[in-house]
């Protein structure tokens, strides 16, 4: 037994050394570091689904006073980047940033990833209403937030510019800049920013989005 003790001690020291080297290379990621700073931004570890009772989907429709009511699931869609990431709410409180998350990493988000496209106050523009929260996408600073819908808010109006790939470029009417994301983000999510409109499809910068079907909970068929 004594013959094996030195060998076992040596193996333990090597394992500890290897673990230390691996931990030295790990890169901590902070989601709050990736978005413009704002006193209105509140970051949470994950979306907290509302406990309020919801209206049956068959009673949903939009009203003329600018307040949003529910609607049939077929009236909703996702805004999907070329890498499959979906534009989504992350923190449920109003005036928080929007992000782009792949479906596989945002299944717990539920319907906050779905949007309804509606005419804006001006005929040629549109606004996007969240299915779960009833809030609207709004251009703010260098990115997008979600806030109470109002037809009088120009920051909530967007122009859809078609491309020859079937995708669209989403242009903020108030800022004249376009919604941009990183299609090869090193994290499982991507920041969403506003930048000069050029229809970019570069490796680290993309402005093309697809109006895709909504993500819905699937039911297994026995």
Swiss-Prot record:
Signal peptide interval: 1-15
All residue ranges annotated as the Ricin B-type lectin domain in the record: 122-211
Covalently lipidated residues, kind S-diacylglycerol cysteine: 16
Membrane topology qualifier: Lipid-anchor
GO molecular function: carbohydrate binding; toxin activity
Region (Mediates binding to target cells): 90-101
One annotated Gene Ontology cellular component of this protein: cell outer membrane
Chain's role: CDTs are cytotoxins which induce host cell distension, growth arrest in G2/M phase, nucleus swelling, and chromatin fragmentation in HeLa cells.
Name this protein carries in UniProt: Cytolethal distending toxin subunit A
Phylogenetic placement of the source organism: Bacteria, Pseudomonadati, Pseudomonadota, Gammaproteobacteria, Pasteurellales
